[in-house]
Amino acid sequence: MSKAAIQFFRGVNEPVVPDIRLTRSRDGRTGQATFRFEQPAAIAPETMGDITGMWMVDEEGEMVTREVNGKFVNGTASALEAVYSWKSEQDFERFMRFAQRYADANGLGYSQSQDSDQTEGADNQQA
């Protein structure tokens, strides 16, 4: 079983663990996960190459988003923000399986927002 990982460059795992926030439509069919990486290795000065996407890789395969933006402070890259969107319950369930594997691989926990409408049902998903 391969370890779940996030990559900005194919084959290179990002060591910085992001803050991840989920939002879902009321019917649960659509939604998005916003990933925020503070000082990720992918934007270190010694890293050469353009970031063209964020890959979420695990034993089932990979998911990708091309919606990746840099955040700058005083002209210096300080963070990356990526948004992964889903359009069906199956896509959401697949994302949650990845998220559980990624959390397990990185010793992370899950906490539900005070605004339960945004993450309703997310904590009931089984890996």
From Swiss-Prot:
Keyword Magnesium: no
Species assigned in the record: Synechococcus sp. (strain CC9605)
Coiled coil: none
Pfam families cross-referenced by the UniProt entry: Psb28
Statement: the UniProt record of this protein carries the keyword Membrane: yes
Domain of life: Bacteria
Subunit structure comment from the entry: Part of the photosystem II complex.
Any one GO biological process: photosynthesis
Keywords: Membrane, Photosynthesis, Photosystem II, Thylakoid
Region described as Disordered: 108-127
Annotated localization: Cellular thylakoid membrane
Family membership: Belongs to the Psb28 family.
Membrane topology (UniProt): Peripheral membrane protein
Gene that this polypeptide is encoded by: psb28
PANTHER family: PHOTOSYSTEM II REACTION CENTER PSB28 PROTEIN, CHLOROPLASTIC, PTHR34963
An example Gene Ontology CC term for this record: plasma membrane-derived thylakoid membrane
Protein name: Photosystem II reaction center Psb28 protein
Residue ranges, compositional bias (Polar residues): 109-127
